[in-house]
Amino acid sequence: MLFDRLIVHHDRAPTSAAMNMAIDEALLEQATLPVLRFYGWRRPSLSFGYFGKFAEFAKETKTRELVRRWTGGGSVWHGEDLTYALITPASDPASAHGPTFIYAALHGAIRDALLIEGTETQLAADAAPKVSDACFANPVRDDVMHEGRKIAGAAQRRTRGGFLHQGSIQLPGLSESFRDRFAAALAPGIQQTSISMQILDRAAILAAEKYGTMEWLHRW
């Protein structure tokens, strides 16, 4: 398994796109153990990678909240998906693994959990030719595929403090048991907790001063 212990947060109350990104960054700043966070979105949203050009997505502001991620990758529609983040502090042995190893390990865990739930999927053997800036239009190696369609993708960022992996599973209605099986495939020791007020307070600052600002949204 990837970890010995794993903290799991189930965010029951959907929040804004900016706050979702801010919570992930705050967890990366302060986590002392690996954390798996599942969360939802207050409104239909679109997140796009750090280097994405806002002008390409500006028209979506009429119907969706837009947010620039701290991680890379393409654009992702949110609302009916299951969104998650994995935070690995630099102090954890798993942080020594490269990004492709972690990517494959997480998507392998998703594949195995889905199979137990009755949905057979495969990991993509190779990257497909890029056809757009939409994440789910462009399978890369080890993405989760179902009936020829990419259903799980992710983006990553590494800092001195650790590793952030933000993922989306585009299968509406995934059960609570799927989340439990996904987490159990990553570590033998699972601890389910709520996010601390310290993290939420820090996230509120990051949302107000970074992710919710026009400067950040229009960065490129």
What are these regions (language model features)?
Residues H9, L28, R37-Y39, S47-G49, ...:
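Residues in well-ordered beta-strands of folded domains
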